[in-house]
């Protein structure tokens, strides 16, 4: 999947009580029923429909696409949302000034009136996902060129999207290619545009260790920020207005103070950027024998140039 494809996936890190080996894998929530028996055997206490359901409230209704590339989760019945500090960094920066340096000092709204609006920021709730492979490839023949295939996929996808967003207010849809174009899914979202900053720690906490620590484990970063989603009086999406009220989620996460124990079942629900877990063998061969060697050569050349100029300065 390309980086621009922000597709909701359940990444399973299931820990059996007798071992510490992670089962791993990335799974579409709509297909999680194929894994539920194994998950329950490892300690999961819910059903597949508790994770993903289009008819009843489920965990999917508490997990949101924050902006266009981050994951957030609802943690209160009044629209309070938790996401990463780096995901809210742009909004924190926009509200900062010389007098109020929220990046340096942090920010906490002491009342609803102090929460800060963020023009252009949206939060998207997944309504449903649907396999539309047959509809997307309708009219395609194996004898056609790649350019013809791309055109057919684009036109069919647009028609599917246009039809899907007619279903209600505030809907946004995408058609995404999975498994390198072998399968296509429609993702239908309900998008809320009134999202207000509630709180964030100082960058010395929220960005502690920077990008270096971002790729390390364990981490010691307070990488979080808090926002609140607002809606109109009928709980529907609406542009920013002082008349809007906190969104009432179908589902939200209750935060436990009990902590976790070794062997507890764990899984991650969110919007990862991309995965190459299912890349084919020739793709791996290309990375190993062609892509990476060229990258190493280019970066070595750049470092040589930098080092030469540094030694002369």
Language model regions located:
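Bacterial Sec-dependent N-terminal signal peptides
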Residues: 1-24
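Terminal presequence/propeptide segments associated with secretion/organelle targeting
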Residues: 18-313
């Amino acid at each position: 999947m390309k980086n621009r494809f922000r597709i909701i996936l359940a990444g399973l890190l299931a820990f059996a009580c007798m071992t510490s080996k992670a089962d791993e894998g990335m799974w579409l929530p709509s297909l999680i029923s194929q894994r539920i028996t194994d998950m329950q055997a490892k300690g999961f206490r819910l059903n597949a429909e508790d994770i993903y359901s289009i008819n009843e409230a489920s965990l999917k209704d508490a997990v949101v696409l924050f902006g266009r590339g981050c994951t957030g989760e609802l943690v209160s019945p009044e629209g309070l949302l938790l996401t990463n500090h780096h995901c809210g960094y742009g909004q924190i920066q926009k509200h900062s000034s010389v007098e109020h340096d929220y990046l340096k000092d942090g920010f906490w709204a002491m009342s609803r009136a102090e929460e800060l609006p963020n023009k252009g920021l949206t939060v998207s709730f997944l309504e449903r996902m649907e396999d539309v492979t047959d509809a997307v490839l309708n009219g395609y023949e194996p004898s056609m060129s790649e350019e013809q295939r791309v055109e057919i996929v684009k036109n069919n996808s647009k028609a599917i999207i246009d039809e899907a967003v007619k279903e209600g207010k505030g809907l946004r849809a995408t058609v995404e290619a999975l498994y390198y174009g072998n399968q296509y899914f429609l993702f239908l979202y309900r998008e809320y545009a009134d999202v207000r900053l509630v709180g964030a720690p100082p960058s010395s906490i929220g960005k502690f260790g920077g990008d270096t620590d971002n790729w390390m484990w364990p981490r010691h970063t307070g990488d979080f920020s808090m926002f609140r989603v607002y809606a109109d009086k009928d709980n529907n999406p609406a542009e920013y207005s002082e008349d809007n009220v906190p969104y009432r989620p179908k589902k939200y996460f209750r935060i436990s103070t009990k902590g976790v124990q070794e062997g507890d079942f764990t899984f991650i629900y969110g919007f990862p950027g991309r995965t190459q877990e299912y890349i084919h063998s020739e793709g791996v061969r290309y990375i190993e024998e062609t892509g990476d060697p060229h990258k190493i050569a280019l970066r070595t050349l750049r470092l040589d140039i930098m080092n030469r100029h540094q030694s002369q300065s």
